[in-house]
Structures are given as C-alpha cells and as structure tokens.
Amino acid sequence: MAKGTAKGAAKRGKIKAEEPASPADASPRLPAGRHGLPREFITQNQRERIITALVDTVAERGYNATTVAHITKAASVSRRTFYEHFADKEACFLAAYEMVADHIRASMGAAAKSFGEWPQQVRAALATMLRFLASEPELARLCMVEPVAAGGEIAARHRATMQDFVRILKAGRPEHSGERPLPEATEETLVGGIVSLIVREISAGRSAELEKLLPDLVELILSPYLGTEEAERLARTDAAPTAD
C-alpha cells in the first residue's frame, strides 16, 4: 500500500487504482461570497466534501440511519448542491465505496504480483487488505459492514467486489493434489468465511487488530488446496509479505 494514511484521500475522492494514496485531510470549506475560484475547482471541492461527510456520518450512524440532511449538514452544502452531484444517498455511498474498493483491489493485485507462487500471492493479497482495513476503521466499516446492512444495489456491488478474491483463489485449483476434486463452491465458501470473520472484528470495534487474523485466514484458505500441514507451515511463516 502507498505510504502514509489513505483515509483522507479516500474520503475526498482521491483514491484511484492507478495513483498512490497520500496523506490528506477533508477539503476545507469554500470562502463565502464572491471568491473568484474556477467552477471546476468549486464542483470538485463540493463533491469531495459530500463524500467526506457521508463517510463520517455513516461511520457514526450507520447507513440506514444516515439521511441526506445529515450529509449536507456535515458537508456544509445545500440539498440542491447535493443533488447536483448525486441522485440520492445510495449513489453517494456507491461513489465512496467504489473508490475504496478500487484502491484495495489495486493494492492486492500489486502485492500478489510481487510473488511467483500462488500460495504467497494469496498471503500477500490478504495481508495487504487486512493492513488497509486495520489502518482505516471508518473505511473498513464503509466497505465491509455497511453494504450488508444497506442491501439492494449496494449489497449487490459488494458481492461483485468479493468475486475478485474468489478469482484469486480459483487460480490455486491446480495446486490441489487430493483424490477428489474440490467442490464447485469452495472459493465462495472460503471468501464468505473470511468476510464474516473480518466483519465480526470490525463490528466489535477491533479493526486495529485485523492483521492478527492473517495466519488463521491464510491457513483456512490454503488448507483445501495444499493440505493442512503445508497450509499451516506457510501461514505461520515469519516472512509476512507487504505491498509497500
């Protein structure tokens, strides 16, 4: 992952898959009156403030209890300005979610490419995701907990995002040497279990402890493919991969 904290950049809409995240705080409020700033700057500033406000408000209240009024108050913008940028609360949430998900996806991919063997690729990708979620508790809740509570298109988008990790795991099927082939639902079951464990920790206020799950999660993932002994050996190795 890029150096420094990604939270400010993510909340301001700055996280992109092709760009590193950098330290940043929420966008400052625009000065009142005739400021002479370019319209493009004003528009971008407003959008960033709205997304920042959504992340903060959802972290405090949860998605379902958050209203457009809460968001506009936190962003210091009018309802009219909000609807100039987003069709509704769901669209605003999805904009924030996609930026964070894209960043995590790109970071995991970059980490995995640093290793030639599939087991190490899995470990590197998972370590990168856990590190990001542990360092950004508000964004961890945004992208792992709230989509399930929100339901609808947000939950559907979250399920689609989780398929990225399913594809990473399916690449390991040639590693399987057992007599019986792996069940078709193996990867979906593994990802579902991983997500459930991560959500449990975030919901309990233990986001900062997420990286401690890495050995157990790696062992859980690799066991069906490599067998329990080899999976445990790789999971307990001290050489933790990084994406920095």
Residue locations for each model-derived region?
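C-terminal peripheral helix-coil segments that are non-catalytic and often amphipathic
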Residues: 1-34, 131, 167, 171-174, ...
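Basic, helix-initiating cap at the start of DNA-binding domains
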Residues: 2-61, 68-74
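Helix-turn-helix
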Residues: 57-91, 95
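Short, structured motif recognition centered on aromatic/hydrophobic residues
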Residues: 63, 104, 139-143, 194, ...
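Short, basic, alpha-helical segments at the C-terminal edge of helix-turn-helix-like DNA-binding modules
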Residues: 68, 97-105
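Hydrophobic alpha-helical connector segments
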Residues: 109-138
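Amphipathic alpha-helical segments used for helix-helix packing
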Residues: 133-152, 166, 170, 199
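Amphipathic alpha-helical packing segments from all-alpha helical-bundle domains
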Residues: 152-175, 184-196, 212-220
